[in-house]
Design a protein with these regions (language model features):
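Secreted/periplasmic carbohydrate-active enzymes, especially glycoside hydrolases
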Residues: 1-156, 161, 166, 192, ...
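Substrate-binding/catalytic cleft of secreted carbohydrate-active enzymes
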Residues: 134-137, 146-371, 379
Length: 392
């Protein structure tokens, strides 16, 4: 058609029980929006286009909040001339309050797991839609309420099932091998990153962005801090509704959230590292010569554990962090000790365990590559799911 909807963004407002709608359209016309919950109509609005855009506010007669574990979704029909779009949205807000990460104004401890989006047959391509659903279900069965979608822009279908499940995810971008010492490296990276932000903006499950991971110095050349700062600024300019971590683990330049990676395998040493921080002192950072922890903002250990357990007998070709435990009992004791140290810290708002399932040579998943459980997941869930010190 000559008149059509090119793209649209949704802005939930819980206090007003409204949905802000910003659309880019082609041709002249009137955009009409109708919302439904459980098949019942609960709001409508229309507005004429001006200069190729339409901005309007949709009032809702029924407010159902999208929350962790409860992916309450509204259906939305958008009509512009002959063009009709069937869409959906979730009513949820995120904001930072000191050291806390608030979802709908409630402090929520994020029990995250690293998910790299690998599959034995298709590698980066899931064999079926059911396989995408299963990964969310397996994670939640282990007591996690979300994931770092690690070094991969996941498919929209996966994100849809995260939306349905109320499963919290962090959007990332693959950056392995990027020359962080040269701003010219952004020539291809930045446009692709901005495309990911635009494509996935409306997913309520995405509660934050992280464009880079472990930005080490590149072949002896120092990281260019302006490279990270510029991508952070572009991310925040495009999306004012979500926090952004400039680079996960290191080396931080400007960030809304401070995170570190720590694969210490001794629970006592691991806990001792953060004891001062637990008591209100400084955060110990093993990259202290390159980055300084920011006090008073949300902080978490976004990679830890990575405990090797060779369930399939792969042997010497398999890999995990540190010395693997000799028994499953030893594994569970180590897992509990490491995780307890983070749950009990009133200045930590989240953790992210490495990782959900084995990936190729990496044998540090809680499930095998084929998604078979290595351990009693009820035990893992009990460790993960207990109340954290920072939680409401």
């Amino acid at each position: 058609p000559e008149s059509y909807i090119e793209k649209v963004q949704y802005y939930p407002n819980l206090a007003e029980a409204t949905l802000g709608i910003k659309a880019v359209v082609k041709g002249q016309g009137t955009l009409e929006a109708k919302a439904f919950y459980g098949g019942e109509p609960c709001g409508s609005v229309s507005a004429k286009s001006e200069g190729g855009t339409v901005t309007m506010t949709l009032p809702l007669s029924r407010l159902e909040k999208w929350e962790p574990g409860h992916g309450r979704l509204y259906d939305l029909t958008l009509t512009y001339g002959e063009d009709k779009v069937e869409s959906y949205f979730g009513m949820r807000e995120v904001r930072l309050d000191g050291e806390k990460f608030l979802i709908n104004d409630k402090s929520v401890f994020q029990r995250l797991v690293l998910d790299q989006g690998f599959y034995p047959d298709g590698i980066y391509t899931a064999p079926t839609e059911e396989a995408l659903v299963k990964d969310v279900e397996l994670s939640m069965a282990a007591g996690f309420n979300g994931a770092r979608l690690h070094q991969k822009v996941f498919e929209p279908l996966f994100l849809y099932h995260c939306d349905k499940a109320g499963y919290l995810v962090w959007g990332e971008q693959g950056c392995w091998g990027l020359d962080y010492s040269n701003p010219a490296a952004l020539k291809y990276f930045l446009p692709e990153w901005m495309e990911a932000l635009e494509r996935d903006f409306n997913h309520p499950a995405i509660i934050g962005w992280c464009p880079f991971n472990e930005t080490w110095d590149y072949e002896g050349r120092r990281q260019d801090d302006s490279l990270l700062a510029n991508v952070y600024k572009m991310t925040k300019l495009y999306d004012t509704t979500r926090p952004c971590i400039d680079t996960s683990g290191n080396y931080h330049v400007v960030t809304d959230i401070y995170d570190l990676h720590n694969y210490e395998q001794d629970p006592a040493k691991f806990a001792a590292t953060y004891e001062s921080f637990k008591q209100g002192g400084d955060l110990e950072d093993n990259h202290g010569y390159r980055q300084t922890p920011v006090k008073g903002i949300p902080t978490f250990i976004s990679e830890y554990g990575g405990i090797k357990w060779d369930e399939e007998g792969v042997g010497k070709d398999g890999w995990g962090y540190g010395a693997g435990p000799a028994t499953k009992e030893e594994f569970l004791n180590r897992y509990k000790g490491l995780t307890d140290a983070l749950l009990d810290n009133p200045h930590m708002f989240a953790f992210c365990y490495t990782q959900l399932y084995d990936v190729e040579q990496e044998l540090n998943g809680l499930y095998t590559y084929e998604r078979k459980p290595k351990f009693d997941m009820d035990v893992i869930k009990a460790i993960n799911a207990r109340k954290a010190a920072i939680e409401d």
